[in-house]
Structure formats: structure tokens, C-alpha cells
């Protein structure tokens, strides 16, 4: 199996009208979802070339290598595109917490409780 050059891989991704694509970081080995961030073509290319997760900061308008200042780096082990090519899944080896709040994941402490279903899902599936 041959490995495609980064530019070919970047060209295969469907970016939105702002030139961005959502990227979900997942811990290698456990499958734990760590965070979601945005990538543009330049940050995806940097990620593919260096092996370190590099995102696009919408608030700062610049590339952002995850953990560059905190030391909480993400070593990228694999990048997968979904079936439409408009969402990326990065399998990473996370050093330290992934979230800027200091928690392991960005999905800690904000669980939205589902209301009781009006219809039993198993009943509706029949």
C-alpha cells in the first residue's frame, strides 16, 4: 500500500465555506473522545507533515499546535475522514489533559440529561 502525499490527502477533504473542517481527537487505545477543534488546509497539512495535532484557532485567526505552550501535546497516530469527507477523526496519544480547563477531556462536567422518551425506542423500532 502506498502512502499519499499530504497535499493529495488535504485535497480529498471537504472543507466548509469558511475553509474549515471539524476534527475530533480520540485517545489511541481507549477510544476516549478528548476534544473537537477546527482545521483548515494549512493546519491539516502541518499535522500530516509533523505528526503533531495542529488546529486552526478561529478566535486568534492562526495555527495552533495543541499543547505548544502547556506541554499537553497530541501525537497523531492516524487521521480518518468520515464517509462524506467533511469531518476528521484524529487518533492521538494525549500528553496531560486535553481541555484548557485542566480536565482530561473537553466533555467532562457538562452532560445534557436526556428527558424520558415519549415513546419507548424499542417499541418504535418494531
Curated annotation (Swiss-Prot):
<feature type="binding site">
    <location>
        <position position="83"/>
    </location>
    <ligand>
        <name>Zn(2+)</name>
    </ligand>
</feature>
<comment type="similarity">
    <text>Belongs to the PRA-CH family.</text>
</comment>
<feature type="binding site">
    <location>
        <position position="106"/>
    </location>
    <ligand>
        <name>Zn(2+)</name>
    </ligand>
</feature>
<keyword id="KW-0368">Histidine biosynthesis</keyword>
<keyword id="KW-0378">Hydrolase</keyword>
<dbReference type="GO" id="GO:0004635">
    <property type="term" value="F:phosphoribosyl-AMP cyclohydrolase activity"/>
</dbReference>
<keyword id="KW-0479">Metal-binding</keyword>
<keyword id="KW-0460">Magnesium</keyword>
<dbReference type="InterPro" id="IPR038019">
    <property type="entry name" value="PRib_AMP_CycHydrolase_sf"/>
</dbReference>
<feature type="binding site">
    <location>
        <position position="84"/>
    </location>
    <ligand>
        <name>Mg(2+)</name>
    </ligand>
</feature>
<dbReference type="InterPro" id="IPR026660">
    <property type="entry name" value="PRA-CH"/>
</dbReference>
<feature type="binding site">
    <location>
        <position position="86"/>
    </location>
    <ligand>
        <name>Mg(2+)</name>
    </ligand>
</feature>
<keyword id="KW-0862">Zinc</keyword>
<dbReference type="Pfam" id="PF01502">
    <property type="entry name" value="PRA-CH"/>
</dbReference>
<comment type="pathway">
    <text>Amino-acid biosynthesis; L-histidine biosynthesis; L-histidine from 5-phospho-alpha-D-ribose 1-diphosphate: step 3/9.</text>
</comment>
<dbReference type="GO" id="GO:0000287">
    <property type="term" value="F:magnesium ion binding"/>
</dbReference>
<keyword id="KW-0963">Cytoplasm</keyword>
<feature type="binding site">
    <location>
        <position position="82"/>
    </location>
    <ligand>
        <name>Mg(2+)</name>
    </ligand>
</feature>
<comment type="subunit">
    <text>Homodimer.</text>
</comment>
<feature type="binding site">
    <location>
        <position position="99"/>
    </location>
    <ligand>
        <name>Zn(2+)</name>
    </ligand>
</feature>
<dbReference type="GO" id="GO:0000105">
    <property type="term" value="P:L-histidine biosynthetic process"/>
</dbReference>
<dbReference type="GO" id="GO:0008270">
    <property type="term" value="F:zinc ion binding"/>
</dbReference>
<protein>
    <recommendedName>
        <fullName>Phosphoribosyl-AMP cyclohydrolase</fullName>
        <ecNumber>3.5.4.19</ecNumber>
    </recommendedName>
</protein>
<comment type="function">
    <text>Catalyzes the hydrolysis of the adenine ring of phosphoribosyl-AMP.</text>
</comment>
<dbReference type="GO" id="GO:0005737">
    <property type="term" value="C:cytoplasm"/>
</dbReference>
<keyword id="KW-0028">Amino-acid biosynthesis</keyword>
<dbReference type="InterPro" id="IPR002496">
    <property type="entry name" value="PRib_AMP_CycHydrolase_dom"/>
</dbReference>
Amino acid at each position: 500500500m502506498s502512502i499519499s502525499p499530504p497535499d493529495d490527502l488535504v485535497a480529498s477533504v471537504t472543507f466548509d465555506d469558511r475553509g474549515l473542517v471539524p476534527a475530533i481527537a480520540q485517545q489511541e487505545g481507549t477510544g476516549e473522545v478528548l476534544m473537537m477543534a477546527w482545521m483548515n488546509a494549512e493546519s491539516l497539512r502541518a499535522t500530516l507533515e509533523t505528526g503533531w495535532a495542529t488546529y486552526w484557532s478561529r478566535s486568534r485567526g492562526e495555527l495552533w499546535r495543541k499543547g505548544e505552550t502547556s506541554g499537553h501535546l497530541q501525537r497523531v497516530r492516524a487521521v480518518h475522514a468520515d464517509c462524506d469527507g467533511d469531518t476528521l477523526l484524529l487518533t492521538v496519544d494525549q500528553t496531560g489533559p486535553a481541555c484548557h480547563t485542566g480536565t482530561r477531556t473537553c466533555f467532562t462536567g457538562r452532560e445534557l440529561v436526556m428527558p424520558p422518551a415519549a415513546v419507548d425506542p424499542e417499541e418504535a423500532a418494531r
